[in-house]
């Protein structure tokens, strides 16, 4: 897990039954290195790769993701981040909510959560 996961007492992702819940994920590496500091598109790519790795580590795959929530620090980033999301989930089309928030901690421009359901049958 990341530095902040241990400090704050949470998991990147948890699996309960068939559900995988991925915590709000930002483009941070280590304790404080923001990846693609001024690039919302680059942050979205980094975040979605991190989310897919977390889902995979718990036995899921991209096609198991049924919901995403995208938080943007600036609504002007909606199109560029949405296009990245669209490339990652083309043809899968999970439920999605995208909202602008008043602020994200640090220099983050994007934060994304995800939920997956793994058919264990």
Q: Whereabouts are the PLM-identified features?
A:
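Short, polar/acidic, helix-capping and beta-turn segments at strand->helix junctions
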Residues: 1-121
């Amino acid at each position: 897990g990341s530095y902040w996961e241990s400090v704050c007492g949470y998991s990147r992702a948890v699996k309960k039954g068939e559900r995988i819940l991925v915590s709000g994920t930002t483009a941070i590496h280590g304790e404080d290195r923001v990846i693609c500091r001024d690039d919302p598109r680059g942050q979205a790519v980094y975040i979605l790769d991190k989310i897919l790795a977390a889902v995979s580590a718990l036995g899921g795959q991209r096609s198991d993701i049924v919901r995403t929530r995208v938080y943007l620090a600036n609504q002007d980033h909606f199109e560029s981040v949405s296009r990245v999301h669209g490339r990652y989930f083309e043809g899968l089309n999970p439920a999605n909510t995208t909202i602008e928030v008043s602020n994200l901690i640090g220099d983050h421009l994007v934060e994304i959560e995800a939920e997956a359901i793994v058919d264990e049958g």
